[in-house]
Amino acid sequence: MITVLINGGLGNQLFQVFATLATAIRNEDTCYFMHMPRDATGKRTTYWKSLLHNLMPLTVISTPSNVQRFMRLPVHQETGFRYTKLPSKTAMNSTPLKLVGYFQSDKYFADVRDEIYAKIQLIEQHDGIKTMFQDSAWFSGGAMTIAMHFRIGDYAQIQDAHPILPLEYYRRALHHIVSNVPSADLYKPNDDGNDVITDVKFNVLIFNQACDDEVVLEHMRALKADPEFAKRCRFYKVPDMFEDWKQMLLMSVCAHNIIANSTFSWWGAYFNQNPGKMVCYPSAWFGPALKHDTRDLFPADWVKINSLI
């Protein structure tokens, strides 16, 4: 049996949950998760009653005795940031093995990704979020949707480790997408049956934390004023009232993704089922204080965009 120490925000938690599920599937083993309202630090909420509610049968109530047993379990500690193979014979263990780490690479679970998607009912959750926003201007007029994520707030004091991305990164990423979308994707039939190209070809959905609204709205105004985007794009600020996990799902039903140096929008892009999606990620994921090797973090078909000023 396998379990894991849940630590960090939603993006980090998903890496931990997916790595655990994948190891159990691969090893023909069982797994469980400690059902706690917050992560190991006590600072971040967990998502057993929302995004991950379909995994509830795999959770164990966090009674004091269960927590004590959990804390005493033997540990498999992640040894570095790059992908390393997880134990392959866990089904033979008489005592559950506890994974501890971040496991930030889809190499931990890509081979059984669809099976895990089925377990969390990702397709059904996509259908639900599409229905929720089907009448929104965001998805109207035949325009293609692009999710753009800004991460500023908690990075402001730790930029040596997690740099704040400059506006120029987003400008370059948006340029890459609007310049590389096949022209056939920008046409739609009109009333007489002929294909016409619309003036507005892209609806750009802006995602950020409420504390960053002032800076992000300034960036949005700058992008709107850019001659390259002024006539081709409409920009929409996604309201802060939506729960974070719903925002992640909303990112994932857009056609394309421009992510921040954040595992939150990494998953918003990874969950995207559009076979023709373009995902842009920043060249600088960490700052100089963190020497992590990120070669295994990004799928091969994602596009690295220069994020230096």
Residue ranges and their predicted role:
Residues 1-3:
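Extreme N-terminal starter segment of soluble prokaryotic enzymes
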Residues 6-15:
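A short, glycine/small-residue-rich beta-strand->loop->alpha-helix junction that serves as a flexible
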Residues 16-23:
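Short amphipathic alpha-helix
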Residues 29-40:
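A short beta-strand-loop structural module common to alpha/beta enzyme folds
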Residues 40-202, 298, 305:
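Secretory-pathway luminal glycosyltransferase catalytic domains
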Residues 41-57, 214-229, 291-298:
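Short, aromatic/basic amphipathic alpha-helical patches
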Residues 197-289:
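Donor-binding and catalytic core of enzymes assembling or modifying cell-surface/extracellular glycoconjugates
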Residues 287-309:
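Leloir-type glycosyltransferase catalytic cores
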